[in-house]
């Protein structure tokens, strides 16, 4: 039960059948979330920049460009559906890492179809990792959920899952509150915190089970 992000990859191409499965998952998320997320393979340009080296990325040749029409809730939807895709990639044997700032945005834009009114929010580095990644420290439940003494099991499981979620800036700046089966999650600020909130909410749903609660 650890949070891992993989920044170094081996030079192994993603097979066509895996690419097709991933593309199908992306298409489904685009349809459901009103997004324009795109898979970019065999392209090293976006991670061949000073920022990428500063971010300790090595040999990234594939990524998922997280694009959508500009809207107040775009970042949160990008986080939610981007993480859904990242977990699908993991099930297909791939490794990923959320990348908010340390990649070449200009180079990535050239490879993507970004329409008028759309925005490239961030990317997911993708491929076969040299290792299974680096461990990130996680907060305790009491740090993200105050004033809870006797919490139901589904809520505890949801919080445990949320704390294991990777976040775009590795900050875990969020907190949860509950009133019966109505749950609220909010960002406590910082760069890309709305993206992080979407990621965290998706993980909470996996742990808690959507049949047990509703967002408020």
Where do the language-model regions lie?
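Acidic, surface-exposed loops and disordered segments
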Residues: 1-216
């Amino acid at each position: 039960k650890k949070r891992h992000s993989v920044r170094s990859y081996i030079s192994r191409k993603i097979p066509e059948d895996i690419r097709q499965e991933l593309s199908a998952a992306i298409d489904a998320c685009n349809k459901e979330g009103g997004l324009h997320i795109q898979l970019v393979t065999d392209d090293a340009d976006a991670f061949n920049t000073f920022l990428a080296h500063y971010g300790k990325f090595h040999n990234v040749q594939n990524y998922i460009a997280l694009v959508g029409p500009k809207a107040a809730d775009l970042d949160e939807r990008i986080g939610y559906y981007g993480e859904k895709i990242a977990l699908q990639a993991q099930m297909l044997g791939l490794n990923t890492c959320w990348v908010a700032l340390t990649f070449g945005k200009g180079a990535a834009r050239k490879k993507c179809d970004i329409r008028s009114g759309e925005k490239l929010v961030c990317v997911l580095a993708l491929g076969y990792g040299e290792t299974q990644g680096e461990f990130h420290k996680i907060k305790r439940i009491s740090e993200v959920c105050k004033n809870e003494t006797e919490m139901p099991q589904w809520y505890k499981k949801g919080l445990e899952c949320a704390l294991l979620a990777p976040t775009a800036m590795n900050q875990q700046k969020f907190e949860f509150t509950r009133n019966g089966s109505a749950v609220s999650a909010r960002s406590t600020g910082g760069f890309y915190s709305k993206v992080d909130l979407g990621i965290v909410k998706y993980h909470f749903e996996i742990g808690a089970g959507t049949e047990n609660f509703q967002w408020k």
